[in-house]
Amino acid sequence: MESLLLPVLLLLAILWTQAAALINLKYSVEEEQRAGTVIANVAKDAREAGFALDPRQASAFRVVSNSAPHLVDINPSSGLLVTKQKIDRDLLCRQSPKCIISLEVMSSSMEICVIKVEIKDLNDNAPSFPAAQIELEISEAASPGTRIPLDSAYDPDSGSFGVQTYELTPNELFGLEIKTRGDGSRFAELVVEKSLDRETQSHYSFRITALDGGDPPRLGTVGLSIKVTDSNDNNPVFSESTYAVSVPENSPPNTPVIRLNASDPDEGTNGQVVYSFYGYVNDRTRELFQIDPHSGLVTVTGALDYEEGHVYELDVQAKDLGPNSIPAHCKVTVSVLDTNDNPPVINLLSVNSELVEVSESAPPGYVIALVRVSDRDSGLNGRVQCRLLGNVPFRLQEYESFSTILVDGRLDREQHDQYNLTIQARDGGVPMLQSAKSFTVLITDENDNHPHFSKPYYQVIVQENNTPGAYLLSVSARDPDLGLNGSVSYQIVPSQVRDMPVFTYVSINPNSGDIYALRSFNHEQTKAFEFKVLAKDGGLPSLQSNATVRVIILDVNDNTPVITAPPLINGTAEVYIPRNSGIGYLVTVVKAEDYDEGENGRVTYDMTEGDRGFFEIDQVNGEVRTTRTFGESSKSSYELIVVAHDHGKTSLSASALVLIYLSPALDAQESMGSVNLSLIFIIALGSIAGILFVTMIFVAIKCKRDNKEIRTYNCSNCLTITCLLGCFIKGQNSKCLHCISVSPISEEQDKKTEEKVSLRGKRIAEYSYGHQKKSSKKKKISKNDIRLVPRDVEETDKMNVVSCSSLTSSLNYFDYHQQTLPLGCRRSESTFLNVENQNTRNTSANHIYHHSFNSQGPQQPDLIINGVPLPETENYSFDSNYVNSRAHLIKSSSTFKDLEGNSLKDSGHEESDQTDSEHDVQRSLYCDTAVNDVLNTSVTSMGSQMPDHDQNEGFHCREECRILGHSDRCWMPRNPMPIRSKSPEHVRNIIALSIEATAADVEAYDDCGPTKRTFATFGKDVSDHPAEERPTLKGKRTVDVTICSPKVNSVIREAGNGCEAISPVTSPLHLKSSLPTKPSVSYTIALAPPARDLEQYVNNVNNGPTRPSEAEPRGADSEKVMHEVSPILKEGRNKESPGVKRLKDIVL
């Protein structure tokens, strides 16, 4: 029993030191418990001690070692420690003071739990003696105090429950003395208290009782029979009462241990001593040792093993053969010496199962197995060292009582699916003993490898027109993993081929990787295409890789050449050539297209039938040329069968019939070579592109300059009829639009200018009028469409309007005039006939002259066109430096748009046809507007002194402008924006010129004759206007300087047959000062001091004869004037003189 407890205790001591790897649990249970008794809940206690138990594991515990596997065990799932059978401590541990069962349990989390179960002893056994009766023979000669050992009682219980004392039936002759052996057991000796006398009593009977330490104590009794014999005076005597010897373990049988010797001085049989084991010597000891009864030699009879038992006690007695012999006793203690006779023993326990398996994804440090090495030897003989042999990705981690095998590198099952490991253990004895154990570690598979294609790029060549379903190629991917991890399936990655899914072109077998064509390929449509094949395994998660497959479609000669030139009708082409064409004349060029490639698409030409003797064909370029000349006697037509064939293995061809006609009307032109139409086409496109580019640059520069000029010039000064006609006569360029004054003219030039004005002024009118009629297809406004409607508002000032048949044209051109004139320019005043509101007149002193017509009458008629009255506009002051936005002016002129339905939009074409001549109309409308202003309005020109500064500079220009150029500030207005009227009509920004006519004016108009009714006399009566009053014009809009040549007035006045119905065009600035009436003149002309021609004209007017009152100028009918001016304008338009061109440039 002690031999079993010592290794367990040693193991527990070693495990206790490994606090980081072990947890100790201690329990106790009483003996004699039935099987299935629950000792403890190890799972609960282990969890409380810090174990990380996985509840999902079916087996939470695994028993590593168990000192009593037949007695106790642990349930692997519940963790309950239970008894397997009834435990008898007396048999398990015998006399050991403590009886402990040790278990080592490993949890699923690789934590080790050491369990110690102490078996508690119960007083369940009573002391017993080896025999039922003890018989003794005591010589009567025994002296008092003689001690005779008695057989000891045996109690299997341990400790206090063992034999504690002996009792003898009370008497006077004998007594008992209790003694203790070295192992703690107690025995009794019979002591002779008094001398014996055999003759008195030769036999005694007593009872000896053995008692244990229980409560109540258990007892065992034995009978003692004492026979008093005759005396043998000398007893054998040992030299020593105790002997101690040692013997090596594994000593062979008959190995002497000790020789005992007891002396007896008696002679004969009384002195002959015999030896024997006496007392309590167990059976195991008797098996190991024996004593020679005659010699007293103790020898070895069994196999001594230090690990089984290393100390034995032998009780030996010696007695003589004489009667009444009293034996002598001694104790022999035999110690077994340990030798290195046990090699280390290696025990391997896998963590997961009986087989050592580990996943290839196990990280370094992962425990795969537990190794326990034991050596039954002691000391250095039992101290063992272990190591792992071989170059393997594992290592051995040693502890005091066990070792672990850990992963020490990267595992790859695909390279090594198993490893053969050898563990070697050796002790420290002399000689050294060692042992080895080999085992196999299986590497389990993980899905750690992607499928790998044999090559990343596959290419297959297939001819077009293949059969759908034809096999193309096979792709192969290998996955070194096992099972589902290594099973590879294939699929095509979705993509597009010519805007169609690739699945409509090819398919793949998911298991074998065979790729098939789903359609018949056409090389002319698709020469090659690519797609990707995806290979993925069946692992979780699945791994995949892809490869590119390129399908090249070879061309097959499946397309017949198609003749494209000359054009065929039902397979026949007709060609005309001159009859006098010579040899080598190019008749036609035969062209054929073949959609195949290479030799399959290379086309050559030939003539197979027909009049081949007259013509030849170039086999490469298809040129058909004459080989002889044709005379007058030649027939008029020839036939040729032209064949175009390709050069495929199976040649395909196309033929056409070419009819060649000889035509005498054509001029023979020998063709020296073929004309490269593509080159001509490219050259033409390049030329057109170059011309367009240059044109765009020119237009951009022109527009940029025009935009700058809009901000530069004072339009109110340059758009007078004087400036316009001056440019036309003198040949000034478009820079005149920047001018704000007229250069002085010499007297000689004055006369020439007057003649030119008289002629070219008429041409301007005809030119403008003629274009207006040419471009007008839509309905015009006639006099029948115009009627006068009485006004509801009474006005004190009325106006007389000069009649003009071209007023409708003026109204039609007003819209264009509004859009084309620069900002701030005056509109045609014939479109602004209205009554001036006296309350809105501005009497500023900045303006010198004021002209007005005074009319008498209760109501002012409104102008009605096509049944729709034109809106009225109130007059308001307008400063010359105030420039409205173009958009505002266009909006304000919307009332007069398209009065005659004429479109003023440019068609974008250069042709001057009836429908697309709007662009030309716009080029002439400016002149028409100016002429109509002259013909329809009689207003005296006025102006003021021009400031002294450069004509090309603005009011804000500085010295640096002449060097660095002008900025936006230079073109800003000089004066702030005036305050306008808040009337609704004012918002529309329509500026009206109100003209007041006096009674004298009415009479003057009437003097022209009752048949000459003008537009100004509609609704007027001659008697309402006194003839004595002089006309006074009140111009509501003018500018600082009004420039008007008097010669122009005289020329135009002559054209009006003496009835002055035309006035110089005034600039758009409100004239605010009144002019005194002068009976000697019809009109007062504004004087511009810098102009000498104006000065001379004023002098002529002041000093010339006064016309009689009956010859006062009346409003003239402009139809007659236009009739006379039109031929002049037509002549100027046809000649396109430089002056006309310059005038067009100015207008545009």
From Swiss-Prot:
Keywords: Calcium, Cell adhesion, Cell membrane, Disease variant, Disulfide bond, Epilepsy, Glycoprotein, Intellectual disability, Membrane, Metal-binding, Repeat, Signal, Transmembrane, Transmembrane helix. Ca(2+) 12 binds at residues 447, 449, 479, 481, 485, 537. Changing residue 404 to I: In DEE9; disease features overlapping with Dravet syndrome. Ca(2+) 2 binds at residues 31, 90, 121, 124, 157. Ca(2+) 9 binds at residues 340, 342, 375, 377, 381, 427. Changing residue 199 to Q: In DEE9; disease features overlapping with Dravet syndrome. Residues 1-21 form the signal peptide. Ca(2+) 11 binds at residues 360, 414, 445-446, 448, 481. Ca(2+) 6 binds at residues 232, 234, 264, 266, 270. Gene3D superfamilies: Cadherins. The keyword Thylakoid does not apply. It is found in: Cell membrane. Ca(2+) 15 binds at residues 557, 559, 594, 596, 600, 646. Changing residue 543 to P: In DEE9; disease features overlapping with Dravet syndrome. Residues 22-129, 130-238, 239-346, 350-453, 454-563, 569-672 form the Cadherin domain. Residues 906-921, 1109-1123, 1130-1148 have a biased composition (Basic and acidic residues). Ca(2+) 5 binds at residues 140, 199, 230-231, 233, 266. Glycans are attached at residues 261, 420, 485, 546, 570, 676. Residues 700-1148 are cytoplasmic. Residues 22-678 are extracellular. SUPFAM superfamilies: Cadherin-like (SSF49313). PANTHER family: CADHERIN-87A, PROTOCADHERIN-19. This is Protocadherin-19. It comes from Homo sapiens (Human).
